[in-house]
Structures are given as structure tokens and as C-alpha cells.
């Protein structure tokens, strides 16, 4: 069901919080690094098995000097300057993460509407599309109080709609969404988590 009610958020950002774009950048960067898959990985000459014995003596053979069969010049040797699948991490304190989420949520305060989830007997994308209000072409974030499997599966095929639990809210979907829907049950959870007061 859709309820044509907008929320008023009774919280004013102080002057310091209004200029904390760097905190939003750090929070978004931390999340993107945490979900990135570092797939490409090559081994250096030190990581290749074997190559401990010198192939031939240093002088007197007429051949080029060689100290290991695992040199990058050799077939079966290591790779010089290849990609290294080393995961990069960026630490973000808990207080910083909550403050960044609050700032992003406050920036989206004019895009918030109350939309309560319908009751579904079984997952169906067609049914949920008929029951929900017309979806805009721009992304919509739907914040719910709990994870309903039927509702989650029904909305999975809708590209412009993303569902998230209120207790798992973070910066990226708030910045991604052009419109935000919140269920009635999710309001007290958000008020407690973000330390804001919302009123219909």
C-alpha cells in the first residue's frame, strides 16, 4: 500500500557536518573496496616452485648468465610486474560510518515517502508490480523493517527498485536512490539508529 505522506525530519546538521563531503567519500570508498573482487593474480619468481639450483656455472660456458630457472625470462618462470590480487582495505570507524549515513539520509529527506509492503502469498514480480505505485525510471530505495522472503524474491527482477533492511542501511544506496520509500515499522528503527526524529 502507498500512503501519500511525507516525513519531516527534526534534525539540523551543524556547520561542521554540512561540509563533511570527505566523510561520505571515505564511507563510499570503504564499501566499494570491501566488495571488490581482486581476481587477477600472478606469481613472482620468488613464489614459483623450484629454481633453487643454478642452471649452469657462471663462467666458461659461453652462455648468458643464469641464476634460476624461474627467472621471468624463462619459460615457466615468474611474471615481472604482473597484476597482484592483493585486497586493499580502508578502515572506517563506527562513529564515522554512522555519521556518514546520517548525513546521506538528511540529504535525501525531501525524497522520502511512506510505502507499506503488501502481503504476498507467494513470490510474483507481476503481482508486486501491480500492487505497488508506478515506479519511476530513476532508482528507488525501499527501506523495510524485516526481510520478507516472498517480497524480496518478487522485487528482485525490478531493476529500479532496491530493498534493504532499516538496520542495515548505509551510504551507497542512499546516494544511489532518487526516491526513498519507508515502511511504518522501519521508522522507529531508523530513528534509533540515526538518532533523528521523524514525524508524518
Swiss-Prot record:
Family membership noted in the UniProt record: Belongs to the universal ribosomal protein uL4 family.
InterPro entries: Ribosomal_uL4 (IPR002136), Ribosomal_uL4-like (IPR013005), Ribosomal_uL4_dom_sf (IPR023574)
Locations listed in the record: Plastid, Chloroplast
GN (gene name): rpl4
Region (Disordered): 45-71
Keywords: Chloroplast, Plastid, Ribonucleoprotein, Ribosomal protein, RNA-binding, rRNA-binding
Gene Ontology BP annotations: translation
GO molecular-function term, one example from the UniProt record: rRNA binding
Gene3D superfamilies, per the entry: 3.40.1370.10
UniProt keyword RNA-binding present: yes
Pfam families reported in the protein's UniProt record: Ribosomal_L4
Stretches with biased composition (Basic residues): 51-68
GO CC list: chloroplast; ribonucleoprotein complex; ribosome
Biological role stated in the UniProt entry: Probably binds the 23S rRNA.
Protein name: Large ribosomal subunit protein uL4c
Assembly: Part of the 50S ribosomal subunit.
Amino acid at each position: 500500500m502507498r500512503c501519500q505522506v511525507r516525513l519531516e525530519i527534526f534534525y539540523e546538521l551543524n556547520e561542521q557536518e554540512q561540509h563533511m563531503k570527505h566523510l561520505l567519500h571515505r564511507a563510499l570508498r570503504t564499501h566499494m573496496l570491501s566488495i571488490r573482487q581482486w581476481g587477477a593474480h600472478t606469481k613472482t619468481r620468488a613464489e614459483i616452485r623450484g629454481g633453487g639450483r643454478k642452471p649452469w656455472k657462471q663462467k666458461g660456458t659461453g652462455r648468458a648468465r643464469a641464476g634460476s630457472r624461474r627467472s621471468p625470462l624463462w619459460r615457466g618462470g615468474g611474471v615481472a610486474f604482473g597484476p597482484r590480487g592483493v585486497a586493499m582495505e580502508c578502515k572506517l570507524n563506527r562513529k564515522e560510518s554512522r555519521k556518514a549515513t546520517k548525513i546521506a539520509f538528511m540529504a535525501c529527506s525531501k525524497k522520502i515517502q511512506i510505502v507499506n509492503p503488501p502481503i504476498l502469498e507467494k513470490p510474483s514480480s507481476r503481482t508486486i508490480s501491480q500492487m505497488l505505485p508506478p515506479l519511476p525510471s530513476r532508482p528507488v530505495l525501499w527501506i523495510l523493517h524485516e526481510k520478507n522472503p516472498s517480497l524480496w524474491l518478487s522485487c528482485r527482477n525490478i531493476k529500479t527498485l532496491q530493498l534493504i533492511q532499516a538496520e542495515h542501511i548505509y551510504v551507497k544506496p542512499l546516494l544511489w536512490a532518487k526516491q526513498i520509500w519507508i515502511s511504518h515499522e522501519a521508522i522507529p528503527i531508523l530513528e534509533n539508529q540515526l538518532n533523528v526524529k521523524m514525524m508524518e
